[in-house]
Amino acid sequence: MSTPESPPTEPTQPSSGGGLSLRIVLSLVVIVVIVGGVALLTSGGGSNRPSSSIVHGVASSEYRGSLTSPAQPAPPLSLHNYKGERVNIDQYKGKAVLLTFLYTKCPDVCPLIAANLGVALNEMGPAKASKVQVIAVSVDPRGDTPTAVAAFLKRHGVAGRMQYLVGSAHELGRVWKTWGVGAEYDAEQPQLVNHSGLVYGISGKGIVTTLYAASFTPAEIVHDAPLLASS
């Protein structure tokens, strides 16, 4: 177990000024509460996939994931990856983008998300996978070192296929706020992070179109990614 550290001083919870994307996530939180799921996951927790038939912010569609309603442009996202290269979400226009928020010390939810995204890319085949970009944003500015990230990506089969973005607590905190993501160090086990466990499906035109809980299946991504890329 890592030596306990003090939580970061920067705000780690979204505020009422979080912007357009925050309304998407807050709508989803209401839905998930209604159906008995959990949108804010602890590092050892889990979540049920929100029903796509619920209409309070999520609508039925041809997608297997939950369709955001109304769909909104993806908020800004520009950080360095663990290799020090600047990555901007806008550079992937024309591709489906699957965006999630992870950390390398996570004992269960994050490995599950990363591994299932890797399986989905494998099952798509090279042609379809080339039209998909997976992005993870760190929720652990202290623990997600370049060495830790490289090992995590290799361990879960997404090395070279997932852009893992890192930064200072201040840099990451701004992104969490913009995307309406909850992230905070656990009070009793500060090496763990309580965080939102969603995957955002973003269309080729840069629109946040679908949402997936941590319990998504690779088959859902295999089905939805080509639709996202072409929409």
Regions found by a protein language model. Give the residues of each.
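Hydrophobic beta-strand positions
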Residues: 78-79, 201
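Short active-site neighborhood of thiol/selenol oxidoreductases, capturing the structured segment around
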Residues: 87-117
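Short loop/turn microsegments at loop-to-beta-strand junctions
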Residues: 74-75, 97, 196-197
